Each structure stands twice: as structure tokens, then as C-alpha cells.
Amino acid sequence: MPMALDTSFSRAPAIAPQPKGIIDPATGLPVGATDPTFLSINDELADRGFLLTTADDLITWARTGSLMWMTFGLACCAVEMMQMSMPRYDAERFGFAPRASPRQSDVMIVAGTLTNKMAPALRKVYDQMPEPRYVISMGSCANGGGYYHYSYSVVRGCDRVVPVDIYVPGCPPSAEALLYGVLLLQKKIRRTGTIER
């Protein structure tokens, strides 16, 4: 005798999935859900179905959403830099993907102690990056020499060799701190624009 197929589960009401992302404990909404920029974009898309913008705003939006970063790991901070790109923090969801070549990179993360011997190599790699280029100084050693500040062979901050846009403090800074520095860099790019820097 054939068995009857139970289809009672198909009549269950559909339940919407919970919003994904970092939830703000104060509001219970994902972080950035009340950002006026995104709200105005959503309203304009709902009204017209398309967006009107300037070329500069479009280029800035594209640039902040597709920053390619190059590692310049010199010491222990490089471990936290690698941790930021792993699945737990997943920097690529913010459009921040790693590249191996300076000619394909927009951002250089200097992580660790910069010595006098390594300074010319840092400058050479920085000069190979296309414009506009940005530098994140990660950790106390890259920011100002750190623990080895008084050593004869240490550069007291990578800003003496290349211009730095964002400083991430700590010894070593956590992956969350570096990710916050990346978000600050994206905010700085949006604020500064692309035509003039």
C-alpha cells in the first residue's frame, strides 16, 4: 500500500529573515540603517527608479567601494592585518580586497617597525602605486617607532618616508581597529573627493 505524502509543512506562514550585519544595541537595527545618505538614495530610487549624480560623486562612490590594498607587513602587526582579511572580519564585504602588486593597489598598509634599510624600499613601492594612493600606518612602530623608538636603525614613523592618511594606534592593534581605520579612510575619500586631493 503506498504511503500518503504529508504536505502540512507547506502551509506554514513565511517568516522574513533577520537583518544581517552588526546590530546596534541602542536601536536594534543594522549599523548604518539610519544613515541619511542611504535613506535619501533609497527614497530617490523608490520615486524615480534611477539616480542622478555628478561624475565626481560617481567616481568617489566607485573608488570607496573598490579599494585594493597592498600589504607591507614588516613585523608582528602583519598578523592582525592578515586576520582582518579572514572570514571573521571579512574586509572584502566593504570592497577592500588585497592585491599583491603595487601597480594594482590603491592603499598601502604599513604594519610594523620600519628600519632605515627598509625605508627606500617602502618609498619605491609607494611610488609604483597609481594615483590617487593612500597609506594606512598600522601600529605603534609604524606610527612613531614604538618600542624601538630610540634605536639607531629605526625610522621614527613611516610618515617621514611616505604621506600617511590614517593612523591606527595599538601594539599590535586589533583587526577591528584596522577595519575601523579602513572605514575612516573610505569616509575621508568621500569627504575629499577625487578631482582634487
Swiss-Prot record:
It comes from Methylobacterium nodulans (strain LMG 21967 / CNCM I-2342 / ORS 2060). This is NADH-quinone oxidoreductase subunit B. GO terms for cellular component: plasma membrane; respiratory chain complex I. Keywords: 4Fe-4S, Cell inner membrane, Cell membrane, Iron, Iron-sulfur, Membrane, Metal-binding, NAD, Quinone, Translocase, Transport, Ubiquinone. GO terms for biological process: aerobic respiration; electron transport coupled proton transport. It holds the Pfam family Oxidored_q6. SUPFAM superfamilies: HydA/Nqo6-like. PROSITE patterns: COMPLEX1_20K. It is a peripheral membrane protein. NDH-1 is composed of 14 different subunits. Subunits NuoB, C, D, E, F, and G constitute the peripheral sector of the complex. [4Fe-4S] cluster binds at C76, C77, C141, C171. The gene is nuoB.
